[in-house]
Amino acid sequence: MTEIHDKKLYRKKRLEWRLALFGLLVGLASGIIAVCYRLFLTKVDSLRTSVLLSATFWQSVGILLALLFFAFCMHRLLLWAPYSGGSGIPQIRAELLGKIDMAVEPTIVSKFIGGILGNAGGLTLGREGPSIQLGGMLAKKASRLLDVSEMEERYLVTAGAAAGLAAAFNAPLSGALFAMEEIHKSLSHLFLIPCLAACLMANYFSFSVLGVQSAFAFGIHATLPVTALGFIVAMGVLSGLVGVVFNRGLLFANRALP
């Protein structure tokens, strides 16, 4: 009986160490692609602004033609990799639920290039969703190369998605919490081990390349008085209501429009 218990304990510890090691590898890969995506978006945004501010009439015509070309390229990319469209978060969730099976290479290439082209065209595209999908897809590719089990692959895809978010915003805890609340929707130490390892590794790489400053850095110049706490609670309630109305409005529009 003791021997059986020892074997189970050994297998459990071995699995935990495997997940931790693979989580570090996935976190490094996700961190690299998320940081590269963030750097490209920053450069493209700066270039677009400088070009628009100094453009002459005929240069503006050239810009319009370039936008049409960007739109055509994005259309072709979506035909090639249809799951690369949209935010990227629902797609990762559907992948983990087994509802879709995204092709790794086309999705990564289309998401990366399409996001840059969309940003160059002035579309309001954030880096959260793309970084999550890019990280998740790289984790899926790594899982296939490492020949892990289906359960381990699901954990690593979740870890890769969380690491992408962590690297995009220099926020490792936010990445882990997001994965737990929005993607995995459960709490397990087997899930937390690779997720935290991946987030920490991705964030370390992001710090090494981009510095330790947070994505949303602002100074605190005054202490909030206690009397204002009631307004903060009211603002939180109001913001929640607005979010619910907005989400239901989007769902209604998707059902109503052809």
Model-assigned labels for residue ranges:
Residues 1-258:
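Alpha-helical transmembrane segments and immediately membrane-proximal extracytoplasmic
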